[in-house]
Structure formats: C-alpha cells, structure tokens
C-alpha cells in the first residue's frame, strides 16, 4: 500500500508550554478544525480528547503525551501533546526526542513562565525548531507586547511577531498577518467563519513598523535577503516566507503568532504556520546512530522509505483493551504489521503484532508505517523506552535518552496479601512506562520503596495503582534521596589477606581518592606500572569500589562525584583472586572515609513563587526559614515573582503553606537543580537517624 502523504507533506510536532497556558485546549482545537473530533471538549470540564487518563481529567492537567494524527491543507500532522508540569519533564524530553518541530504556547497575561523556560531549554538541547503561539488573548490582563518581550528577556531568543492582534481581552477581534499584510476578522464564536479584510487604517502604521522589524530579524539570518533589505529593494511574499522557513528550521528564528484557542481564534492560522514554517522529516538533519557491535562507527538513518528500517521507541503504555502499546518514530525505511524486527539495544528479536495510529485514546489499524511516521505497535514484549528497533539485517543503535535519577522516595505497603501480587504487577508495568519511576525492596526493612521526580509524580502513580490495578496500599512519608561525596584528597591502602587452611585470599591496593567536579560522577583511573597489580584484577578493583560506593561511607547514601586513581598494590601468585581485590578496594574506600572529609549532599530545588506584592514579606521569610536562598525577584504584571533555591527536604507540604500565606493567591513551581552540601547539624541528625535504623 502506498503512503497517503509524501514525506515533504508530513509534520511531526509537539505542543509544549507551562501548566495552564492552554496547551491541551489548543491541541483540541487543532483536532476540531482538522476534522478529527466533532464536539470540542473543554479541559476545565474534564472532557478533553487528549487528556484521556482518569487522573488527567480529574486534575485538568496533561500527564502522558498522547500522540494524535490530523490532516490539514493536504498535509499529515502528527501531534504529541506534552505535559507542562515540572514533575513530568521526562515525558517532555521523550516527545522532543522524536519531534521535528514544536509549538510553544504562552499565556498572553504571563508570557514566559518557569516551566516554559525548562521545556524551551530541553527543546534547544535537542535542536527542535519552534513557533510561538501567544494564547488566551481574550483573558483579563492579556498583553501581546509584554509576552513577546518576555521571549527576548527570559529566553534570549531571536523571535519576532509574524502576526499582531487587534484588541485584547473582550475586545480581541482580529489578527493582522504581517507576512501577507492582510487582516483576518472572526465573525462567529466557533471561529469557522473568517473574513479576510484590509488592515484597518488606524493599525496600518503599527503593522508596517512590525513588518520592518520582522524583515530585519529574518534578514540577519540570510545574506541575500540582507542585501535586498539594505538596498531598500522590495522583498516579495514568497521570498520572505522561504527565508522565515529556512531560519526557523535552522533554529535561528522563532515566528510569534497570536490567538485564543478557547474562543476559537487564530488556531487555523497557527496550523498554516505549522505547514509553512516547521520542517518536514526531510528538512531536519538525518539522525546519526552507531553500529551495535562498534560504538565508534557512525550510521546515518536517512528519511527514505527505501532505506533499511530504523525506529526509536519513545513511550510504552498499557492500554486496557490491547495490552502493551509501544509508541515509536520511524526514521528510515518501512514496517508492516506481522513482521519481525530486531531490538538492537537489547539484541532481541521481536514480532510486531499490529500497528496502530492513535488519536488520543481511539485507534486505527495500519498495514504499513513509513519513514517519518509516528505509530504504536502491539506485541513487542522486550522493548522499552529509548530502545532502537531496526530491520533484522540492520545493526544500528540510535542515540538513546538519558533519564534523571529520582529525587524523592516513599514507602508503599499493600493492605492485604491479595494486594501484594497485584502491586508487584502494577510496579513492573509502571516502571516500563516511566523510566524516571523506580521501585525496589529495601533489603533491611523489607519495605517496597518507590522513587520519582516530585510529590505530584508519586501521587499520580499511587493513584494509578489504585484506579487501574485495584491495588489498595498505605503510603509512608516522603523521603529525600541524599548523596555523599568527598571534599578532600588522600592516598590510602586497602589490604585483604586471609589464610584459613588450603588456598588463602590476598589482594592489596593503593588508591588516591579525590573530589570530582559536580555532576562528574565516578571516575576510575588505572595508573599501575610494571604489573604490581595484574591486569585481570583491575576491573575487580573498579567493581569493588562501585559496589561499596552504592552504600556510601557516612549514612548509607550513594557516594558520587569522586575520582579514584589506582597507583600501587601487590598480589600473591596463588592466593590472589578477583574476589580478594574486590574486597581490598572496599577496604580502601572505608579507609578513605576517615581521611577525605566526607559530606552529605541534598537535592536543591529551583523554586519559583508568584504572588500579589502584599505577601512578599511573608513569602521571603518563609523561604529563608526553609533554608532557602533567594536568587532574585521580578515584577510580572501586577504580581511579584521570587526565584529561590530550597532544599527538597524543606519543601514537603509547601502547597498548603503557600495557600495559607497568600490566602490562596500564590502559585509555585519547582524542579530539581543540583546537589549541595547539607549543614553540619542536619548532617549529624541524618547520620544518627540512619545508624538508628540500621541498629533496629
């Protein structure tokens, strides 16, 4: 079966934004206008098409990125709706990895908000071209110029409007198109009746100034256009469009559009911009992977149906009707249902049962998927997030995704024996779906400990265990994931010698331990000269250190950011073994704990609090009392914004405290930023508490 849409007529886009900027509503409207749904679902009524998990409809926020296919102007648009809440940044990362372009939605009253900065940063990391949609122009306090200024100030982005609004709040009635210098007026509530009119006389001067600024900004990225611009030559509409498209796909320029998705204005024009300015799979750089058996040999996955099949699995979900669904993006080649593929990441052969194209939570069966497509497969048993799927003869591994370690943990206990088995199943499935969710059994207490990216993240996962898997469980108090590190250097010896009849055990190492830079992780250097420690025992020394570091040296937390240089040692011809050198390495680490000034580190959260000015004093005092460090303040509209770094351990239950301090008028967001040293008195408490737990 031939493909319905050629590659140049395919767009893979994400909708990304801060929580409550109107992202899901915007996606809804796209689906409405592209004929995918017949009645518009409102997020605040809990009836939105994209938010199909029960928890999402209850909370009115988007948690999982549902992939949806729509058609517009003879193009296929695959849309991934991404969550805007910081606890779900991993979902955003996953989506961005497989997109070719994105629409960043801003709230016209607030402009760029903290989570916008986070997702913008992630999109920049992955080199994703973006257009910006300033939404909610009908909202009280909507200010288009202010929103655009925040893009420049907070994101340092080369962005210029390609549209201007006429009016704001209740008066928002039309949109000026600065590329074609025309105006679109809306004559009905559903936004289906649009009248193209001339730019009103009293807005002409403003439009001409804005167009000149647009041409200048785009000309800076295009030498030919710059020559014309400087020579005062006429720049035609096709020339300007082509230059905007090139600058946008090269991630050098960001067109800014305007509208209100809720009141159905500006969405069709935004869809036109997606087609006009965002790249097709042919416009983006080919994805570079490497050979499975040789990580140094690069392999290119070219967007071509005739090439070898290569795809990246970016999401795993459990569907109540068809079981495990694996969402994947095809980078090259084609795939038919019923065929076999190779999971080159795990070196496993898998059979693709059925291929589905998803629309929020309804589905359409496909026989074949082509390069550039986003689809879901049923029947892949061993494939997880970030795995590469390829043809059986192909041997490519696409660059995978790195997921952050959890910063918060809870204990969960099943209420009954029946819940115990169900909980095990639930935890396995939830970990398959979400790589930032970890679960393990504590060896000492026997408790099941779950870890995630924040309180809301774990709340929702516990909620899903109850609703989807019928697991009743008791949840313990949140626990912080502390870490340990060394502050100074020392040379130490670890010697393990045991003789108890027959063959003995002998291993002897001398290691220099020193602090590594923050985020540098563990670095092991083999500086042995002359074979004083035979080569076959070196990996055992490194393994022994890694194992011991997992349990720390002070309070049982993993030891991080440490360098270890093995420079001397000795061995015995008969008695030395891998095990003996492993033990010797762990003894060296114990010795280092006495000399290297070990400290406990705690996760520091970047917290942004927004509230009316009159509560500023109370909030600042509260932040300080939580051992927070204020990093700056700025006015935002008629509110004040405080940026601070606060230890995670001090942020539990902060939502309640903020509510009472601001009479419900304050909001905050936080995400993990870095690890920092714990004050001595608190470190002593942590050590005491942990040694008490071990004694029990």
From Swiss-Prot:
Classification via NCBIfam families: EF-G (TIGR00484), PRK12740.1-3 (NF009379), PRK12740.1-5 (NF009381), small_GTP (TIGR00231)
Any GO molecular function: translation elongation factor activity
Keyword Transferase among UniProt keywords: no
Its job: Catalyzes the GTP-dependent ribosomal translocation step during translation elongation. During this step, the ribosome changes from the pre-translocational (PRE) to the post-translocational (POST) state as the newly formed A-site-bound peptidyl-tRNA and P-site-bound deacylated tRNA move to the P and E sites, respectively. Catalyzes the coordinated movement of the two tRNA molecules, the mRNA and conformational changes in the ribosome.
Keywords: Cytoplasm, Elongation factor, GTP-binding, Nucleotide-binding, Protein biosynthesis
Name of the protein described by the UniProt record: Elongation factor G
Source species taxonomy: Bacteria, Bacillati, Bacillota, Bacilli, Bacillales
Domain tr-type G residues, every copy: 8-282
Species, as recorded: Staphylococcus saprophyticus subsp. saprophyticus (strain ATCC 15305 / DSM 20229 / NCIMB 8711 / NCTC 7292 / S-41)
GO biological process per UniProt: ribosome disassembly
Compartment list: Cytoplasm
Main subcellular location: cytoplasm
Keyword Acyltransferase part of the UniProt annotation: no
Pfam families, sorted: EFG_C, EFG_III, EFG_IV, GTP_EFTU, GTP_EFTU_D2
Binding site for GTP: 17-24, 81-85, 135-138
Family the entry assigns: Belongs to the TRAFAC class translation factor GTPase superfamily. Classic translation factor GTPase family. EF-G/EF-2 subfamily.
Stored InterPro entries: EFG_II, EFG_III, EFG_III/V, EFG_IV, EFG_V, EFG_V-like, EFTu-like_2, G_TR_CS
This protein's GO CC annotations: cytoplasm
Signal peptide stretch: none
């Amino acid at each position: 079966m031939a493909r319905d849409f050629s590659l140049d007529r395919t767009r893979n886009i994400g909708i990304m934004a801060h929580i409550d900027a109107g992202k899901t509503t915007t996606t809804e409207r796209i689906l409405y206008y592209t004929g995918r749904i017949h009645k518009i679902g409102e997020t605040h009524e809990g009836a939105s098409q994209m938010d199909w998990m029960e928890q999402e409809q209850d909370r009115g926020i988007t948690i999982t990125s549902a992939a949806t296919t729509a058609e517009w102007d003879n193009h296929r648009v695959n849309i991934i709706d991404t969550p805007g809440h910081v606890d779900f940044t991993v979902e955003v990362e996953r989506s961005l990895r497989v997109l070719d372009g994105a629409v960043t939605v801003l709230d016209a009253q607030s402009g760029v908000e903290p989570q916008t900065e986070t997702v913008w940063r992630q999109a920049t990391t992955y080199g994703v071209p973006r257009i910006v949609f300033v939404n909610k122009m009908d909202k009280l306090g909507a200010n288009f110029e202010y929103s655009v200024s925040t893009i420049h100030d907070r994101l340092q982005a080369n962005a210029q409007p390609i549209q201007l609004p006429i009016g704001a709040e209740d008066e928002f009635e039309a949109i000026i198109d600065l590329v074609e210098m025309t105006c679109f007026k809306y004559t009905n509530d559903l936004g289906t009746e649009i009248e193209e009119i001339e730019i009103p006389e009293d807005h002409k001067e403003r439009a001409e100034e804005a167009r000149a600024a647009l041409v200048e900004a785009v000309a800076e990225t295009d030498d030919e256009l710059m020559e014309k611009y400087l020579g005062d030559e006429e720049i035609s509409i096709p020339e300007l469009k082509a230059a905007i498209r090139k600058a946008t796909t090269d991630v050098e320029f960001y067109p800014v559009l305007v509208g209100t998705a809720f009141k159905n204005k500006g969405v069709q024009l935004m869809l036109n911009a997606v087609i006009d300015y965002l790249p097709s799979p042919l416009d983006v750089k080919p994805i570079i992977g490497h050979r499975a058996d040789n990580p140094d040999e690069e392999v290119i996955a070219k967007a071509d149906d005739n090439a070898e099949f290569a795809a990246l699995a970016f999401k795993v979900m459990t569907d109540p009707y068809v079981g495990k669904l694996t969402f994947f993006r095809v980078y090259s080649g084609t795939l038919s249902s019923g065929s076999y593929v190779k999971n080159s990441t795990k070196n496993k052969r898998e059979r693709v049962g059925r291929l589905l194209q998803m629309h929020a939570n309804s589905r359409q069966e496909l026989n074949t998927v082509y390069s550039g497509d986003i689809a879901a497969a049923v029947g892949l048993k061993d494939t997880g997030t970030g795995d590469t799927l390829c043809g059986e003869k192909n041997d490519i591994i696409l660059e995978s995704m790195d997921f952050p370690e959890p910063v918060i943990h809870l204990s969960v206990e099943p209420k009954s024996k029946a819940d115990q088995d169900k909980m095990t199943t639930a935890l396995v499935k939830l970990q398959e779906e979400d790589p930032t969710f970890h679960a393990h059994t504590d060896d000492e207490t026997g408790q099941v400990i779950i870890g995630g990216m924040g309180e809301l993240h774990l709340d929702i996962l516990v909620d899903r265990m109850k609703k989807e898997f019928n697991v009743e469980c008791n949840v313990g108090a949140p626990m912080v994931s502390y870490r340990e590190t060394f502050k100074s250097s020392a040379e130490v010896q670890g010697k393990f010698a045991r003789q108890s009849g027959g063959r003995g055990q002998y291993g002897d190492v001398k290691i220099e331990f020193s602090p590594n830079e923050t985020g540098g992780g563990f670095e092991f250097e083999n500086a042995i000269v002359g074979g004083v420690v035979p080569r076959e025992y070196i990996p055992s020394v490194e393994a022994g250190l890694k194992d011991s570091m997992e349990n720390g040296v002070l309070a049982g937390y993993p030891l991080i950011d440490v360098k270890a240089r093995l420079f001397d040692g000795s061995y015995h011809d008969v008695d030395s073994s891998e095990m003996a050198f492993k033990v010797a390495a762990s003894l060296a680490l114990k010795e280092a704990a006495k000399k290297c000034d070990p400290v406990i580190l705690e996760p520091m959260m970047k917290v942004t609090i927004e509230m009316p000015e009159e509560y500023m004093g109370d909030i600042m005092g509260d932040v300080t009392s939580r051992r927070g460090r204020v990093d700056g303040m700025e006015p935002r509209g008629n509110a004040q914004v405080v940026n601070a770094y606060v230890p995670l351990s001090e942020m539990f239950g902060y939502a309640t405290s903020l509510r009472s301090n601001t009479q419900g008028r304050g909001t905050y967001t936080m995400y993990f930023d870095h690890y920092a040293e714990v004050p001595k008195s608190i470190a002593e408490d942590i050590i005491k508490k942990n040694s008490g737990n071990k004694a029990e």
